[in-house]
Amino acid sequence: MRTPLPFSTIAAAALALGVLAAPASAAEPTTATLTVTGGALTITVPTDAGSLGTRANTVEGGTISGPLGEVQVNDARSAAAGSGWVASVISTAFTPPSGPAIAASAVGYTAGAIVKVGTATYTANDPPNLTGVAPAVTATGITGDNSATWNPTINVAVPGGMAANVYSATITHSVV
């Protein structure tokens, strides 16, 4: 037969468990952080534009125009709101293997349509000549990463009486 435990024994056991049990603690928050680093500001240009076009030589001269190829600026700097960049361009003279050159002052640049990704205001500046470093496309009011792509047209005013030949120039883009 079972003997019932006296109430005092049960109360003593419950008290002992209560005293020996770990006290409850308040929850403490943990702060976790992460860092997003900015990338680079880069420009990609065609390595070989090929021919801009052909034109018959005339006494009065004329213009030869053609596409240069796709130019792209990628801005992965995660820039703060309001910052921007400027893509610039410069050209050497168009020179033949022998004979007089066509000066860089006769070389113009038209950016054309700009394909945009990200938040910014893009402006095509279309410099009339490339004798010095000239802004081609600017981006202002940037927030975060962005990119712009365009396919510029190069316009060369060929003076009258130029010798029949193949003329070459180096067109250089940069971005800051």
Where do the language-model regions lie?
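Secretory targeting and sorting signals
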Residues: 1-26
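N-terminal small/polar-rich segments of proteins
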Residues: 25-117, 132-176
